């Protein structure tokens, strides 16, 4: 997914479209996606997030790259509960902003986090 790596190098801001957990309607939001050693993650500060509820019930989503590439990529999200992976993501340079928002122990325990994967036949 070179196009995704290239896009996130300068700016982690993307849009995602999820399917509403209750409504079934498409929901598009702006969010950050982190490139952590070639794997892609979306996280946030501690708290309830509609995007996480949507992805928990409907893990398929569309990642919209909008800075340079302007590409819509089908993807799948998986909730990250493994503490080793969570720590690796939160310790990564790309997650430094989050570490300034809450203590790392709180981020580890309560931050929403999903790993984003792309099908092998996705463009890029």
What are these regions (language model features)?
Residues 1-3, 28-29, 48, 101-102:
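A generic local structural motif
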Residues 2-3, 34, 72:
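Generic signal for short, ordered secondary-structure residues
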